[in-house]
Amino acid sequence: GEIECRSSECCPSGKHLCEGGFVHYCCPNDRYMSCGFLGFGTCYCWKAAYYEYGSTPTC
């Protein structure tokens, strides 16, 4: 399912912190994060049909 992201000091400018279960990634703020089947797959930052890896938060 889709994971909501929010602004955070732990992510660089233009990225929001996305928290899903045990994973925390920074995604561009125009994207949402999804971690695949039941949330146990690899997490990506999605926008329409395009995705990219999230970056690691600094805190």
UniProtKB/Swiss-Prot annotation:
Contains 5 disulfide bonds. It is found in: Secreted; Nematocyst. One of its GO terms (molecular function) is toxin activity. The keyword Disulfide bond applies. It comes from the Eukaryota. GO terms for cellular component: extracellular region; nematocyst. The keyword DNA damage does not apply. Keywords: Disulfide bond, Nematocyst, Secreted, Toxin. This is U-actitoxin-Aer2b.
